[in-house]
């Protein structure tokens, strides 16, 4: 086929760090591109070019998008897209593997070329004529410049009315510049992206409410502007803002070199901290990675003038090696939850194994597997069939899961166990469908089970006017009976460790959109009170309206109590967790204080303060002894690998672990980073096995006393031996008689205090051991309060 195509224009450049050689294996030789370009460009084997219109962008209509493996394992694009999968063969060369119609797998270190169902003739023709096995070349500009005019500089409500109602006076899709005269911080919320600029160079990325440096400023974006910043900013980018508010971001070889230097400094600082604080880390691996990084950076400097593209490649590799050194310098806990939410899609056993292998590589120890969604179960359900509904989600009815038959849940439970991953059932509760999928299966035979909004005069099942979701009517006794049967079936037939309940209340709406107005629920309330709730109005009947909404809330709480009692009657160790979203649902979590074992508050932000604020606000609502994990959205928001690691470290602080949302958006680099860093070693899950987790931590402290603290002079040898004996006695006692462990824990803590007072134990080590013991003591208390037959 003739290849006579012209280049189309675009102003979108490549995103940072990943396009040419990140993670490149040593067998790939570096090649310098001979063609100079101003924008990111794909060149086919015949020499024809096509300019790339964006990187890692889901909006792919009428433009050519390049996806790399920093985005996810899949492109997540819509079916009907036209995509070409490219496998890496050299520094900037790729081999055409095959073509797909959307949501393509992204090869590790490879690319996917993508355009939407609606596209230009030029892009369509270029992709059509690419042949399997053909070599294509990615041409990158050595210097990348992007420019965008800010909506406001140092805004006020008066100067930026569009941003007046919002934190930091930053409105939707706006780009704002903040100078020190604005204040100490930008005062923005977590729903955006910010770059900190010092002396004209980007020194910090991400987050909200950033501190404004005295020697620079912060550029902050929301929505479209946030995407512009993330696509064009790296540590080391050069930034200028002119008198008209035009923000210019420049990336060049020096920018990437600066990024590498900063990464090396960060890693060295972390390594020094590990040494000074006697932390248990992979120091030898960290040292090797730092040496490799510095060698690559020197090579980049050598060829910077003669081969700038090769220099760019070396600096990227140097940055990656420095990142690895940082990850290796982080401690890895012996006991904590490392959980991942996941909606399964696999129709083969090989697909299940691939997902679980990747989860294991990251270091996860628990899968919160979505076992019910869109009104179906993922496993063959006799309860569903009994009530006249399909026995399994149609996607999995013809699945082939080897010895597990068509049972996807069984495959996940058993294959997960082989890899050290337990399964907790994540359920969509009373949300049973969405409008785009049509009437949910439950309402085809049981239309009277539908939850009805006040403004629904038809009485027929209709989706929520806001979310477009369909809801079962939680206040109806028959509906509760059905749902309890589903959860009982799941718990009895599968070795799941717990149930993560979601959507266990009516949607929270104002008067006209409020729920609870089905014929059956209205009749039930009228029978008990003599009042038809549809006649009530909070404006004219405030007390009666409050009585009505309280009655509905009691019905919701009664169901959760029944579910708790049913689960604990089957298995006292079975874990009930809730995941409240910020807002009314988070506040109401205290209603379930006697029925919930663990709470996973959802922290949408990506900085330590916002994550911790979410956790601490939730803890105020629940009794001491409740198991707490932190839910974070690092994968879902497509943070880079370092962002994922930072989020995990922030989220673990003050809790017993982390839940990440969601593995469908995970990326290979982030999985690799977690597996090298904070989740390098296997960890016991304290919510599922609190006593075993406690014993594991005690044994680990014993090992660290011998291998690190005494060896490196942080603890007197004789006193170290005595402390180990105390820990051994405690370990044995916990196994035999956990009910009376407070005294033993406190005795060892006092022993540690005495050692610190006598300068026979370094303060930093003693405080860390005390913190570990306090956490472990809490796990024992959790076991007694939540897993004991008397509770």
Question: Could you tell me what each predicted segment is?
Answer:
Residues 19-34:
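Sec-dependent signal peptide cleavage junction
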Residues 236, 596, 600-784:
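Substrate-binding cleft of secreted/luminal carbohydrate-active enzymes
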Residues 334-340, 406, 424-493:
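Active-site-adjacent "subsite" loops/lids of carbohydrate-active enzymes
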Residues 352-380, 493-497, 599, 657:
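Catalytic domains of carbohydrate-active enzymes, especially glycoside hydrolases
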Residues 362-404:
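Aromatic-lined carbohydrate-binding/catalytic grooves of carbohydrate-active enzymes
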Residues 379-392, 431-464, 503-537:
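Aromatic- and acidic-residue-enriched segments that line the glycan-binding/catalytic groove
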Residues 422-429, 434, 500-508, 538-587, ...:
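Aromatic-lined carbohydrate-recognition surfaces of secreted/lumenal glycan-active proteins
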Residues 497, 502, 531-543, 585-611, ...:
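Aromatic- and acid-rich polysaccharide-binding/catalytic face
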